[in-house]
Design a protein with these regions (language model features):
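Alpha-helical oligomerization segments
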Residues: 133-183
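Amphipathic protein-protein interaction modules
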Residues: 88-150
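Low-complexity, charged, repeat-rich alpha-helical/coil interaction segments
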Residues: 1-2, 8, 15-18, 23, ...
Length: 183
């Protein structure tokens, strides 16, 4: 997938599946893994998404991981921010390692690299703590956090699709008013 996969935007998926917005898509994805209470789940949306993916050869993402098609973009962010190395960590901080950014730029899947945490890379941290990429264990989003200085020259919008969080944005943002995707 990392070498031969083709990116498809969430915006495109929403249009094709007839979802109102990315919040509805998130609800369908999280319903597919049994990650929502029954009052929040949407099995009809889950089924529409599953059908669309099957018909169009789309591999839906797995929860709680940096997707293969995002991995090079994540490495690029740290490289463009001026870092030659970064800290990679597992979910709980039990296994953190300082690795060269070039290791993450390889065409190999991070899950199969012996130099990286045994139970998967869930966090990427700049050595000076000015930039962090984190994936929530039971969700389908990647959060990229940074200082104003760290983000100043980064063109995150050109690498990823998403929205800018505010101080009020919660981990379970699908229950909040929908934040528009950045154009």
């Amino acid at each position: 997938a990392k070498r031969f996969g083709r990116r498809i935007s969430w915006r495109t998926v929403c249009q094709q599946v007839n979802f109102t917005d990315h919040c509805e898509l998130d609800r369908a994805l999280r319903t597919s893994i049994g990650g929502l209470r029954p009052d929040l789940a949407d099995s009809a949306a889950r089924d529409r998404l599953k059908s669309y993916c099957a018909q169009h050869g789309v591999f839906p993402p797995n929860e709680g991981r940096f997707e293969p098609l995002m991995q090079s973009g994540l490495a690029t962010i740290f490289r463009c921010a001026g870092f030659q190395s970064l800290i990679v960590g597992d979910e709980f901080g039990d296994d953190e390692r300082l690795v060269p950014v070039s290791l993450l730029e390889r065409n190999e899947l991070w899950d199969h690299m012996a130099e990286l945490p045994k139970f998967g890379v869930k966090r990427l941290i700049a050595p000076d703590r000015s930039l962090l990429a984190w994936v929530h264990w039971d969700s389908f989003y990647t959060l990229i956090l940074g200082t104003d200085d760290a983000f100043r020259d980064l063109k995150v919008n050109s690498l990823f699709e998403g929205f800018w969080c505010s101080d009020e944005t919660e981990t379970y943002w699908l229950t909040q008013n929908c934040i528009p995707l950045v154009q």
